[in-house]
């Protein structure tokens, strides 16, 4: 499959590219805002580069694409306007294009708390509301999907064992971006993850094993 990675230049996006290169099972198309970002991602292992912007025209990014991983985000520290533009409306635009281009699978990187943003700390509500709106839009779109909601992210290396549940009993732990990327990739092909929404955090199981028992 040719996998379009939206948010390819972010920490998780870079993890996705390097892991997919190591797996050598899929082609990767990295979507970037600037050509120079693409040069760096080519060195990291991206097979193709497409320059496009969530806030502008991106229809050409979906040419000859089989599946999409949406790992873009404005970050929880940006203001509401930017968050809505990227995390909500940008995601919706990508979902619409996925549908019109008959994309086989759309994997969304969401966040723990997106199911109930109203109970989150006030400074996080705009971010989680945008994530919730994007998730719900994807679920109603008719595009085959997986929505992955990690706990707080860390940059720890080689920490790839996880716990995956529809609703985690303990949401206070962190999870490495490396483990998140591994989960997003596994979700592309595992039937247990198709049309599912689940939360992940650090744990004791390999990703593929954990995804078999999310319920």
Walk through the language-model features, giving the residues of each.
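Conserved Rossmann-fold NAD(P)-dependent oxidoreductase catalytic core, especially the SDR/UDP-sugar
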Residues: 6, 11, 29-31, 82, ...
């Amino acid at each position: 499959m040719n996998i379009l990675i939206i948010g390819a230049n972010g920490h998780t996006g870079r993890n996705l590219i390097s892991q997919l290169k190591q797996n050598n099972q899929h082609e990767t198309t990295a979507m970037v805002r600037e050509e120079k970002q693409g040069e760096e991602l080519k060195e990291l292992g991206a097979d193709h580069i497409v320059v496009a912007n969530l806030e502008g025209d991106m229809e050409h990014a979906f040419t000859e694409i089989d599946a999409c991983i949406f790992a873009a985000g404005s970050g929880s520290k940006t203001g509401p306007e930017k968050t809505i533009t990227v995390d909500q409306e940008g995601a919706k635009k990508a979902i619409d294009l996925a549908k019109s281009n008959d994309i086989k699978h759309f994997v969304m990187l969401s966040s723990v708390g997106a199911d109930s943003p109203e109970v989150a700390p006030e400074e996080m509500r705009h971010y989680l509301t945008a994530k919730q709106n994007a998730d719900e839009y994807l679920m109603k779109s008719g595009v085959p999907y997986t929505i992955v909601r990690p706990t707080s992210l860390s940059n720890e290396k080689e920490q790839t064992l996880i716990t995956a549940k529809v609703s985690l009993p303990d949401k206070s732990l962190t999870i490495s971006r490396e483990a998140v990327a591994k989960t997003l990739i596994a979700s592309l092909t595992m039937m247990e993850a198709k049309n599912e929404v689940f939360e992940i955090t650090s744990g004791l199981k390999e990703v593929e094993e954990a995804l078999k028992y999310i319920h």
